[in-house]
């Protein structure tokens, strides 16, 4: 099925769900589009349901993505700290260095999720901005997805007259709503059993360390 949720910002870090719509779809199988017309129809009907009880017009959406095409790996990068004090540009450079890995031509990077930073062998740093040192390292979790899977979903959404602001890995989106910061810090495995796939995310020491997709579901 296709589910549309409309939320309103309560504050900078939380949303209030104000409306929801859902509609079964035969156009999706194991998280990917197998029929453009059927998927477009289900998206439109779920949007109509959600907007029926919402005062306003939805113009853009974030789309959850899953499927057996999802890949992930842990990577790291190292750069020199230009002025001996970490600036935002240094963080950008070390993240870019971490994601400079070879991926298949039919895949694209979906998320670059920082796990920790290291400054001159001092590890477990969450926010390096402003700290002193000469060498900055980043450890990140990279998530990639198939180009055609993204393109097909985006095509279906745009056929409904809606723009796409971005794509979010479904288990990552679920983690924001069901896991506390304490749980992520202590270590937790999230298992999201959907209609087409079972999505897994493992958190430890406050950051994500593993994501996976099993093409079997409820």
Task: Place the predicted regions along the sequence by residue.
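Nucleotide/phosphate-binding catalytic cleft detector across ATP-hydrolyzing
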Residues: 5-190, 207-211
């Amino acid at each position: 099925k296709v589910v549309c949720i409309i939320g309103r910002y309560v504050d900078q870090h939380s949303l209030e769900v104000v409306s929801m719509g859902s509609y079964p779809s035969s156009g999706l199988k194991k998280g990917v589009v197998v029929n453009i017309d059927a998927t477009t129809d289900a998206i439109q009907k779920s949007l109509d349901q959600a907007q029926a009880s919402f005062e306003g017009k939805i113009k853009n959406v974030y789309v959850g993505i899953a499927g057996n095409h999802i890949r992930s790996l842990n990577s790291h990068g190292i750069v020199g700290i230009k002025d001996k004090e970490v600036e935002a540009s240094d963080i950008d450079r070390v993240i870019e260095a971490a994601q400079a890995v070879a991926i298949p031509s039919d895949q694209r990077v979906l998320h670059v999720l920082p796990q920790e930073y290291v400054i001159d062998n001092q590890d477990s740093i969450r926010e390096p901005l402003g700290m002193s040192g000469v060498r900055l390292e980043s450890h990140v979790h990279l998530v990639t997805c198939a180009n055609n899977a993204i393109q097909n979903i985006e095509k279906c959404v745009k056929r409904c007259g809606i723009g796409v602001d971005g794509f979010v890995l479904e288990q990552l989106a679920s983690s924001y709503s069901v896991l506390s910061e304490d749980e992520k810090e202590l270590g937790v495995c999230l298992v999201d059993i959907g209609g087409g796939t079972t999505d897994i995310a493992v958190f430890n020491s406050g950051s994500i360390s593993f994501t996976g997709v099993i093409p079997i579901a409820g």
